[in-house]
Amino acid sequence: MTNIRKTHPLLKIVNSSFVDLPAPSSLSSWWNFGSLLGVCLAVQILTGLFLAMHYTSDTATAFDSVTHICRDVNYGWVLRYLHANGASMFFICLYLHVGRGLYYGSYTYSETWNIGILLLFAVMATAFMGYVLPWGQMSFWGATVITNLLSAIPYIGTELVQWIWGGFSVDKATLTRFFAFHFLFPFIVAALVMVHLLFLHETGSNNPTGIPSDSDMIPFHPYYTIKDILGFLIMLTALSALVLFSPDLLGDPDNYMPANPLNTPPHIKPEWYFLFAYAILRSIPNKLGGVLALVLSILVLAIVPMLHTSKQRSMMFRPLSQCLFWFLVAILLTLTWIGGQPVEYPYVIIGQMASVLYFLTILVFMPLISIMENHLLKW
């Protein structure tokens, strides 16, 4: 008798994706982040659902409803901080997942890579809208500043901003629609994840060597299921420690003050995971130029597959490219630091230099170094 998991119409889809899936035998821990992102998404949807049961999306009561969740709802504070810090974990895993893709040349699977970029934008939009919901000072002013960037679009900019706001300023209509979209988007993300996996399973996984591994495959279960579960335990332990010991470590103290349109905070800044893009935005003195640079800082990933000039797929055996990759990581950390600093000397010039180096490294240095390595290897 054939196993039910191989014959049942629904179970055989699960079986071919998570049980009998042939996987390369050499996958390192860097391949754990995809499944960790799945866990993050599940945690965010579940905690978000329970938070939505107690939250009110009205400017008069939004801030108080979050306070009520933390003080009066059973374990409401756990839900709230799991959701807030879960977002940070989500982005840590996202950036490491993208970094893995860049390092090991996974971007050559262009369909999977492009859906991944779409997912990155969707998650960023979701996180931005979620940050507005507690209706604290940084929520209000962050929403005002970031949505206002759309006014840089020629001709339709101003009308577009007012259309998004639902009025002439960030107000009740804005908060209500942001709540609606913040609730909807994670399900769109979940659907995109399915497409992401569909394209990935068409080609099969890449591996650290970048060499086709068709001759050396092992079943996903039990080898990688147990490896993924270990990853889940490590990540959930880290998240629990963050939530229970220092839940406000990554937040902004200004967000514990109710939104006040008459009082601007001294430094308006987004959550830490957007600071690198915010630094690139601020480093350009022109509004439209800044907005374009902001979008391109993520969209540049879409042209990385076209700039792959190396004869090897992975950076595993390319020491010069490895140096350049870690240089790029250092630039991104510098930009993250600059994004949280005030707009004054020397931070402005450091931000401008780091922004230029960020684009130069991806668009110019990496392709050139790859060509140089080809010549050194006499290929």
Curated annotation (Swiss-Prot):
It is a multi-pass membrane protein. SUPFAM superfamilies: a domain/subunit of cytochrome bc1 complex (Ubiquinol-cytochrome c reductase), Transmembrane di-heme cytochromes. One of its GO terms (molecular function) is metal ion binding. Keywords: Electron transport, Heme, Iron, Membrane, Metal-binding, Mitochondrion, Mitochondrion inner membrane, Respiratory chain, Transmembrane, Transmembrane helix, Transport, Ubiquinone. The keyword Disulfide bond does not apply. Heme b b566 binds at residues 97, 196. It is found in: Mitochondrion inner membrane. Belongs to the cytochrome b family. This is Cytochrome b. It comes from Glossophaga morenoi (Mexican long-tongued bat).
